Amino acid sequence: MEQLDVFLLGERVGVLESDRGKLTFHYLPEYLRRADAAAISYSLPLQSEPFDPVVTSVFFDNLLPPDVVRKRLGKILHLSRRNIFGFLEAIGGDCAGAIALYPPGCTKTADASAPTFRELSDEEASQILMDLPKRPLNIGKEEGFRISGAGAQDKLIACVKEERIVLPLYGAPSTHIIKPPVAAYRDSVFNEFFCMRLAQKMGLPVPECGILTLKDVPYYCVTRFDRQNKDGRISRLHQEDFCQLLSVDPEKKYESEGGPAIPQCFQLIKKMRLGAAGQIDFLRRIIFNVLIGNGDAHAKNFSVLYRGKTIRLAPVYDLLCTEIYDSLAHETAMSIGGETSFAGITRGRLSKMAQECKVRPELILSLLDEMLEKITVASNNLADELNRQHPSTVYAEICRIIERQAAWLAVE
């Protein structure tokens, strides 16, 4: 029997056990007795009994990179891609939210009062970023660097201080996600930056993001919303994506593969009591993704953020206009009133989606019209602004997609 201690917000709360690959999780009795005890997941509520292997595996699997990345990581770490326990043992020191995993008795964890960091030279940072395709997440190269992150795109999860990249070591919390250009998708860095900035202009909650340039190569850099900085001291905030909340296998994140649909996500928001503001926020995100042509808004790209007993939708992330790339499917990740083709999404489809969510169609249409009034002008103004700072033809392409979608959705 192998074991890993599970930490939440720096506190040891439970144990993950592997019996020949079969995973179970249980909370510590002394933790359950605490008045302030909190569950590590909506899908793993506080209880004394161990959780069965299925629900345990799904939650912890969702903390790891997808299979396509794990195949490359496995060659470095000598692990098979389905060895969830092995990967968590190797890279689970800093996960999404406030979860961290360590071998029992491990003493090389971050001292919260004096975490360990190593600043990189521009040359080192540039080399690490260029090497990400063959060394995902920079794993296996730096002692004490145990960081996990979901998502298929190559990324470095680290810290950025005064435009210098810093590696957090031995469990110190990371604060930024840095993404290099994706060769297959032209100007992907500027695409994501534009979509995130546009979301902000449309009133959606957006973490601080920007372009970091190293050796004349632009990188998309975003501040982690599950971290907070108080007087220079970094601490973790807990978060869960909708696959974790609904106990859905991460490889089934798309609705077409059996993953969550919009009505299912909406009902979850109701059950978690995020209130009318949370429901409207979610619907506005759905509309925005349709208008920018984002076909990758699947369940793992929506999360909730915990602050004490307060739960709200996490800021938006991983926004990209996929419609400008001919090699990608021209479909939404979650159907809109039964329609997945961007060309087939109409006001009627949005009304049907509202009915499926048990919401008045008038509400979704009013939210749509509110966004239609602003988004075309806002996107063109943003394109002009960004072209002065980071020139790219991709802005005009995204604006054309937005104009097309807006024209289709303005018609009754």
Residue spans for each PLM region:
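Phosphate/dinucleotide-binding and metal-coordinating scaffold of catalytic cores
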Residues: 1-299, 303-412
